[in-house]
Amino acid sequence: LSTFRSFTEDLHGRIGVDRSKNTWYRYLATMKHLQAFLTAKYRVSDIALAELEQSFIEQFHVYLKTERALKLTSICRYLDCLINVVKVSFNDGIMPRNPFASYRYNEPTPERAFLNEEEILTLQHAALRTKKQRMIRDLFLFSCFTGICYADLKTLAWKQLEQDTHGDWWVTGNRCKTDTRYVVKLLPAALSILERYRDGTDYVFSFMPHLNTVDRSLKRIAALCGIEKKLTFHVGRHTYATTICLMNGVS
């Protein structure tokens, strides 16, 4: 666990540079599950990397499924974190072999929820009760109209917006998660949202609450709007990739 802890501490130092806070949270949660697993199954507080065998991750998988009663999606995320730390340790020469190199598991095929045109219009025109709800709706709709994820919106600066010679506005940047470049044309609906947040600060959305808070609020907003789908912030990216791109002829 000392190696896992060092890896997690390194991740924390890279938040906002090339890693997101959510990634750090995921590795932190994995480490806590590993600590509980070692205590419950091995009666130890740590284990040397050289002692790891494929049976370790197989037992960890079963532990997460039975003892922790986690969903398959969550289990796969935690297994991925453990596999990655061991792989990096092997590549860095910290351990002589990778005991998990041949380990395979079945990942779930997620159902990608997205809003249709009617649901987007309902959300746009809903009379929401509080300023906080209206702000979170704007954040979500901006993601719907641009495909930009939560982590990248959190660091979105006004200087990333540029107008071309035809008068069209574009936003460019590098994704926090992958460091890949993105270029997105700003549709009129997205520009309309931006106009409400010109407050003289460097960042477009300087009020960004924690993602868990946003998702909880979106759940309540969906109920108020009569939208029966499970609304999370990530649904915004899927909505852009489906409904918005089709509506605007974006490939």
Feature names for model-found ranges:
Residues 1-2, 22-25, 38-62, 206, ...:
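A Lys/Arg-rich helix-loop hairpin that forms a DNA/phosphate-binding surface
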Residues 2-31:
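Short, aromatic/basic-rich helix-turn unit that serves as a nucleic-acid recognition element
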Residues 21-22, 30-40, 55-58, 66-101, ...:
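N-terminal DNA-binding recognition helix of tyrosine site-specific recombinases/integrases
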Residues 52, 135-137, 211-212, 228-248:
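Short basic/aromatic active-site micro-motif
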Residues 72, 76-78, 95, 99-150, ...:
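Basic, Lys/Arg- and aromatic-enriched nucleic-acid-binding interface segment
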Residues 141, 145-152, 220, 237-251:
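C-terminal catalytic core of tyrosine-transesterase DNA break-rejoin enzymes
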Residues 160-166, 228-229, 249-251:
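Short, polar N-cap/turn motifs at the start of nucleic acid-interacting alpha helices
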Residues 175-220:
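C-terminal catalytic core of Y-nucleophile DNA break-rejoin enzymes
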